[in-house]
Every structure is written in C-alpha cells, then in structure tokens.
Amino acid sequence: YELHVRGFTNHSSSGVKHPGTFAGLKEKIPYLKELGINAVELMPIFEFDEMINAREVDGKQLVEYWGYNTVGFFSPNASYTAAEEVNNEGQELKELIRELHENGIEVILDVVFNHTAEGNENGPFFSFKGFDNNIYYLLTPEGNYYNFSGCGNSLNCNHPVVQQMILECLRHWTVHYRVDGFRFDLASILGRDEDGMPMNNPPLLKSLAYDPLLRNVKLIAEAWDAGGLYQVGNFPASKRWAEWNGQYRDTMRGYLKGDFWEANS
C-alpha cells in the first residue's frame, strides 16, 4: 500500500489528532490492518527542499509536496513530526514503524538516490556540489550535468565515494529504524557509469545485493529513468532485486478506467 505521510491524514476527514504527521499515520494503523495489507511503502520521508517550487498560485508560493528532492539522506523530514520539541522526528518515526510491525505490517521506504535537490549547474549549493562536484555528479565533458533524472542532475552512483554513502545510508535506516525494504526511484541511473552509459555489472547494485547488513531487506527497482533507459525484465542486478513494471501498471490502470487506448498501449 503506497502512501504519502502528509497526504494520508492531512484532510479533516481522516479523523486523527495529528494530521499530516508520523503520529497521524500511527493513529490510522487499525484502518490499514482492516484493509488486510501486509506492507506500506512510504513515499520519500528523507529531509527535502520544500521551497524548490518557485511557482505561485493566487499570489501564494507553492511548496514541494512529494519529497523527491532530497537534502538530508540520513534524516527524517522534520515537518512530518507532530511534536513541538526540536529533533523529535526520528523518535516519532521509530514509534510508527514499531507499531506497524506489531500489527503485522512491513515498512518499505521510497528512496531517491538518482538525484538531489541541488538542481543543475546553476542550482543551489546544499552539500555534494560544494564537497566535490566532480565526484558526486555525472558531468558532461563541458562540465554540465547529465540530467537522466529530469530534475537537473544525476548522482555519480558508481563512484566509490558515492557508493559508500548510499550503502551507509541504507544501513542506517535498516539498523536504526528497522525498515524492511527500499523502493529505488529511477533505479536505472544507479547502473550508469561516470560517462552516463549503462553498465553490465554496476558495482553499486552488486554491493547492495550482497551487503551483509542488507541481506534481509527487500530491494525494489523502478527499472527505468528519464534518459530513455527502460530495463524492466532486464535490470542489471542480482536476482534479489524485484522490479516495478510500469507498462503493466499503465495497462491495468487503463483497463480499470475503461480507457481503451491506455489499456492497449
């Protein structure tokens, strides 16, 4: 059951005391259990840049909602906590996960390692761009960013430094938060080399599959990217990896909607 932490309880009809938060989601566990589901996939919960959206509607600036522009890979999003105390989001998330587990529901995190909130070469400096731009991002010979994510940049995932960061991040969420699995957004970028070319045996994907601390977690690939690479049924990794099937999803959605074109595309 895929859900957005804020959106799932933000409306008053949810009936929770703490809408739009980890605590609010915890209040809805009986509802989730009644549905008979055995796992929830939380859309991105890492700290992200909510002000990256520069558009305005009726004179009010819109904010980033979905969470796919990560700023802090090791930190839960502070705006998802119900507590007034500072730095309580970690404890609140741990309590949510523990309660879900006690009710027989696993927790899978939607993680975004294909790009960051630093945008293109003209974007803001939050972290990696200032640490070592040449290491962390895929760059063209002219020094511009490869944009296989559609968000301005692409992480250089198979560089040893970046690979280690991703491994440490996943270990962190596995060991300290006890999550059960990860769904990797635009996972095909994780298999590109420093020139942006697809690799037959990407070091990162192999490391994730055989890392001892990750041996019991589920690994799920969204096996395509915005650069035209589509690898459903042919994702270059160990058999431990499962895949999202975008074409099947779209076909079923078209069928259920009665959309003949989408169901047959």
PLM regions and their residue ranges:
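Conserved alpha/beta catalytic core and glycan-binding cleft of carbohydrate-active enzymes
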Residues: 178, 191-195, 199-265
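Active-site beta-loop-alpha junctions of metal-dependent nucleic acid enzymes
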Residues: 24
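Substrate-binding/active-site clefts of carbohydrate-active enzymes
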Residues: 4-20, 30-179, 186-210, 229
